[in-house]
Amino acid sequence: MNHPSLPPQSERRALAIAQAVYEAFEDYHARFSEITACAKQRFETRDWSGAREDAVARIALYDQYIAECMLRLRAVLLGQAHDRALWMRARDRYAALLSGLIDQELYKTFYNTLTRRYFGTHGVDADIEFIALDIEPTDAITVPVARHTYAVSPGRLTDMLVRVLGDYAFAVPYAHRTRCAAAIAVRLLDDLAHWGEHPVRSVELLETVFYRERRAYLVGRVFGEHRFSPCVIALINDDAGLRAEAVLTRRSDVAQLFSNSRSYFQADLSTVGDAVVFLRSLLTHKPVDELYTMLGRAKQGKTERYRTFFSHFQAHPSEQLVHADGTPGMVMVVFTLPSYPLVFKLIRDRFAYPKTMSRAQVEGKYELVFQLDRIGRLLDAQPYRFLRFPKARFSPALLQELQTSCAMSLSEDGDDVLIALCYVQRRLRPLNLYLREQLPEAAHAAALDYGQAIKDMARNNIFPGDMLLKNFGITRHQRAVFYDYDELCLITECNFRDWPTPATYEEQMAAEPWFHVGPRDVFPERFALFMGLPSSQLEAVKHQHPELFDPRWWRDLQSRLRDDDYPDTPPYAESRRLA
């Protein structure tokens, strides 16, 4: 959108603003790429603690470069930081600099973040921000992402895969490249046998290798005569050497690999939008916002999530926001739009007993989640500030509770409600409701996976704190995921104790502990009392996961974690591993 010209001095200043913001984003992108590129060496040298440090450092970059850009702009703005006409013109100048760029949406989000910092924007400001609720920006990306394509001659699949592994070389050699290629070939032929004779006609893999935790992934597609399927080759570098560990061709397996309950990939992509377009061809049901987020572009993920939600929200003007299903929380009020799979979580002004933490501590827990390896068990929770909703869109019961319980987060502006801070997550079915609704076999499997989820988190130094079923949800792929973080802490911070043996009848019958319990004391032998599982499912969990109730297991694990010895947690089922 072009606006009337400003005086020559202001025109020059608008251009200087645009150039400064452009250069700041370029600097951010270069540093982002620099950290991401370290993932290859971390993988080669098995420097897993360094990889975790890189992941945390990369998340912090965005706000660091926004702050640095604001410092640079001081010399340009000269007291005109809140001149709307100047920023409107700067936006036009900035848009001109982005013409033809594949990733111009990332640049625009950076610009929007700056204007929101300067103007304290509540909702959106269409005059100075880049707003496009009615379009899908990736639809305009037609440039194909960089990839390798391999044709397959009949009977020569293993030979082709030997070449693939050679093209993706590392500083450490494959333990046995031909054997790896043969195992991959067998799995592909088994998985795709229903495609008929000679099912694999070609394979297409992104040039960029994806890294996360202890694995590297070659991500692409396998083509038959009339169809294609995802093809992800997982590489591992451990005591047995560098080798292919798994091949994923099922969309459900690949979707779980890219789940928003996992940590972000380290993938050194020169451009991101074209990679998102490619990944959407593999995962057609995966929202664009989650793909951007999983590639480490969390701010862009937030932008796309906002864009798609409010586009849907405006297209359904008669639908009201209501309380989300599930047991009301003592720390959060949670609401949703029934037709859209997101929930919005607001911190209550006061917490019911026995919750004793402060509001700042709750916010700190949600920030901590970004720094952890979430290993498919912690749902991504993005913070949003100053969201604006029409007051009429809230159900009366929801609006009343927000006004009485979340007044610190809520304000009214005419016919609108402003939310100062909320956390937005994918909506899952709460586990306590799911177990009641399912047939016994499905409920049994979910209960066992709930136990596995607690173990997976523990092995990555995560203790949920509150193990009640209502704090877990079930994904589309029937996977138990934790999503309520107000009591989450690190395993290494806990004191795992044996439950004392009562010495007297009075102690044995006491309703409360007869001994001192410190704020970090945890008693695994008592977990069964706080899980809320029906007796048959509880017995199944005890049988399948007995270590959960053994304080010695927790103390041994704690000792390993303190020595930086993190057990491996593969992101796929044992059945997907190669022979």
Swiss-Prot record:
Species assigned in the record: Xanthomonas axonopodis pv. citri (strain 306)
Subcellular location: Cytoplasm
GO MF: [isocitrate dehydrogenase (NADP+)] kinase activity; AMP binding; ATP binding; phosphoprotein phosphatase activity; protein serine/threonine kinase activity
A GO cellular component annotation in the UniProt record: cytoplasm
Residues annotated as the enzyme's active site: D380
Pfam families associated with the record: AceK_kinase, AceK_regulatory
GO BP term, pick one: glucose metabolic process
HAMAP family, sorted: AceK
Function: Bifunctional enzyme which can phosphorylate or dephosphorylate isocitrate dehydrogenase (IDH) on a specific serine residue. This is a regulatory mechanism which enables bacteria to bypass the Krebs cycle via the glyoxylate shunt in response to the source of carbon. When bacteria are grown on glucose, IDH is fully active and unphosphorylated, but when grown on acetate or ethanol, the activity of IDH declines drastically concomitant with its phosphorylation.
Transmembrane intervals: none
Keyword ATP-binding applies: yes
The protein, known as: Isocitrate dehydrogenase kinase/phosphatase
Catalytic activity: L-seryl-[isocitrate dehydrogenase] + ATP = O-phospho-L-seryl-[isocitrate dehydrogenase] + ADP + H(+)
Entry keyword set: ATP-binding, Cytoplasm, Glyoxylate bypass, Hydrolase, Kinase, Nucleotide-binding, Protein phosphatase, Serine/threonine-protein kinase, Transferase, Tricarboxylic acid cycle
Binding of ATP, residues: A324, D325, G326, T327, P328, G329, M330, K345
Family to which the UniProt record says this protein belongs: Belongs to the AceK family.
Known EC number: 2.7.11.5, 3.1.3.-
